Amino acid sequence: MIKSAILVLEDGTQFHGRAIGAEGAAVGEVVFNTSMTGYQEILTDPSYSRQIVTLTYPHIGNVGVNSVDKESLKVQAQGLVIRDLPLLTSNFRCEETLSDYLKRHNIVAIADIDTRKLTRLLREKGSQNGCIIAGKQIDAQVALEKAQAFPGLEGMDLAKEVTTKQIYPWLQGSWKLAGGLPEDKQEQDLPYHVVAYDFGAKRNILRMLVDRGCRLTVVPAQTSAEDVLKLNPDGIFLSNGPGDPAPCGYAIDAVKTLLETEIPIFGICLGHQLLALASGAETMKMKFGHHGGNHPVKDLECNVVMITAQNHGFAVDEKSLPSNLRVTHKSLFDGTLQGIHRTDKPAFSFQGHPEASPGPHETASLFDHFIELIEQYCQKNNRHNTK
């Protein structure tokens, strides 16, 4: 039986459609993502915590879902908005339909609405809070009240909500089409010990670090710098994550302390913003953010343009950069800051997602630069695990 659903934005705009997930209500910031593929990776990306994701590509669900293409243990997005859900799924890796997957994870979703109209509205007015109600009792006024009552992401510390609760090792490399997910690598085959802060880390980031010889110790977001240093790392990674970086004072303080050492530091997405804040810069809320797999970014040092995957609603304010930070990358969509490098420390960061998943891998060389810094650190300090 077809069940109705409604999406109501905080400005009162209504979109009526069909429920394709769980019954109930979902409230969050409504954003749009322009990726054509990778909807399962998007749904399971912790950076989408407290957000309702609108996918602009018209057909979503064609290939179903499987047990491999996930970036975390569960669906992280608050809700899903799409144009059309195909009646059939067709892929040799399909284990479940998208609709069944959403219901199993209790995710409210709506289809059969004009996603082009919604996207244009979000571009013109900026990201808005919204509410999806699905099921038998559809009340637009209740949805509006819920949307307007949502406080918004600015000032909200979500990293401590999505982070791991305990330290764990990660030794698994990247997935291959022929063999699927590989077995964990042996520690003796991974010469570099990297401590990875989990602010909402995507699994593909961890896998790409392992591919380059890193054995990872993943630690909770609120782990102190002192506890990290006790682990004796060769490098420190600051992961992606959701929400506003400014309230994450515990992380900013930890990074400040870690910057007093000579241990290489690499940050992605939220980790990029935290490195900037710890260095004395400021961040700002964007109008509608960057979400998609087709964003052109210029590498200012190599003078090349790369197509990147992006997922963030906050950015580092370039005007606030101190003298010890140099700009390395900028967005060609809106000129916002995309990359920084400390001039006095082996620390750098990137706003986009070089691991993609989904998206292009044109900035994967950033992982290689991190390894170069680690090798230099190990050689300089005569550490036993130098290649």
From Swiss-Prot:
Reactions it catalyzes: hydrogencarbonate + L-glutamine + 2 ATP + H2O = carbamoyl phosphate + L-glutamate + 2 ADP + phosphate + 2 H(+)
Active-site annotation: 269 (nucleophile), 353, 355
Listed EC numbers: 6.3.5.5
Region feature (CPSase): 1-189
Pathway connected to this protein: Amino-acid biosynthesis; L-arginine biosynthesis; carbamoyl phosphate from bicarbonate: step 1/1; Pyrimidine metabolism; UMP biosynthesis via de novo pathway; (S)-dihydroorotate from bicarbonate: step 1/3
Primary enzyme class: ligase
PROSITE patterns named among the record's database cross-references: GATASE_TYPE_1
Residues of the Glutamine amidotransferase type-1 domain: 193-380
Example of a GO MF term: glutaminase activity
Matching SMART domains: CPSase_sm_chain
Biological processes annotated in GO: 'de novo' pyrimidine nucleobase biosynthetic process; 'de novo' UMP biosynthetic process; glutamine metabolic process; L-arginine biosynthetic process
Assembly and oligomerization: Composed of two chains; the small (or glutamine) chain promotes the hydrolysis of glutamine to ammonia, which is used by the large (or ammonia) chain to synthesize carbamoyl phosphate. Tetramer of heterodimers (alpha,beta)4.
NCBIfam families: CPSaseIIsmall, PRK12838.1
The family this protein is said to belong to: Belongs to the CarA family.
Job description of the protein: Small subunit of the glutamine-dependent carbamoyl phosphate synthetase (CPSase). CPSase catalyzes the formation of carbamoyl phosphate from the ammonia moiety of glutamine, carbonate, and phosphate donated by ATP, constituting the first step of 2 biosynthetic pathways, one leading to arginine and/or urea and the other to pyrimidine nucleotides. The small subunit (glutamine amidotransferase) binds and cleaves glutamine to supply the large subunit with the substrate ammonia.
Protein name (Swiss-Prot/TrEMBL): Carbamoyl phosphate synthase small chain
Lineage, opening ranks: Bacteria, Pseudomonadati, Pseudomonadota, Gammaproteobacteria, Enterobacterales
